[in-house]
Amino acid sequence: MSNIRELQDIVIQVRRDILRMVHKVNSGHPGGSLGCAEFFVSLFYDVMEIKMPFEMNGINQDIFFLSNGHISPVFYSVLSRKGYFPIKELETFRLINSRLQGHPTTHEGLPGIRVASGSLGQGLSVSIGSSISKKLNKDSKTVYVLLGDGELQEGQNWEAIMFAAANNIDNLIATVDVNGKQIDGTTDEVLNLGNLKMKFISFGWEVLVLEKGNNISEVIKSLNKAKSKLGKSKPVVILMKTEMGNGVDFMMNTHAWHGIAPNDEQLKNGLKQNPETIGDY
């Protein structure tokens, strides 16, 4: 395991990146991005086996798909700080002709992006296809995908969940960001998802529940435990409980910050709560 203090410093810096990116263009999705900072840092800095520079085909390395593409700020921040592209490019988030669009696309050729993810509900299907490709090519590495809990209200996911288990896709780790919030309210209010653990089990998946998805040590442990479950004829899912807006007190645990930007005073407040650690872009 990497040095947890160093990883936590990166998480804090990523939070700063998210706030500054969204504030500059007065547009974006800070809540879910902040809630998944620990996950992205854990995955890219500690868990995944990746090659640099970026290779689109992902042969003989772990690969990652972001399905809930609206949380692109956290994805872009971690990719840039991991060295996929220059950190200064974060300044272009959501600008015309930028490679860093509000929802990731492949058209711009941004390193780290393997599939467009503007429309919810498609990432799991794509990741299953990639997992099958690795099996056919005798590639032993792992495919990771992140989904939102509200995104599971899209029916395509359940076809994919059924297919993955029926076809023994056991080189796949899906993580669901369970923050209980979406654009119009709580997931219980909008379209209750029921007992996700029992649903995945009934579909034939290996299920892990991560109670502390904003604790970087626990995230790493859970991802490594998921890896230990691979190769046993079942796909693996982590139900990762997070807090929307984590790390910024006035954004925490409310759907109101799903898709709005902080104003000047709110930005100042949020940055004060997350002091610069490894350098602003």
Question: Which stretches of residues belong to each language-model region?
Answer:
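Structural motif
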Residues: N26-L34
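Glycine-rich beta-alpha junction loops
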Residues: H70-I71, N179-G180, K241-G245
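Thiamine diphosphate
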Residues: L110-G112, A116-S119, L124-L230
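Glycine/aspartate-rich loop-and-adjacent alpha/beta segment that forms the canonical ThDP
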Residues: I216, I220-Y281
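N-terminal capping segment at the start of a domain
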Residues: V11-S27, D177-N179
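Short secondary-structure boundary/capping segments
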Residues: K82, V190, M252-A256
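Cofactor-binding active-site loop characterized by glycine-rich and histidine/acidic residues
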Residues: I18-M21, S33-A166
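Non-catalytic, mobile gating and regulatory segments of ester bond hydrolases
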Residues: M1-E6
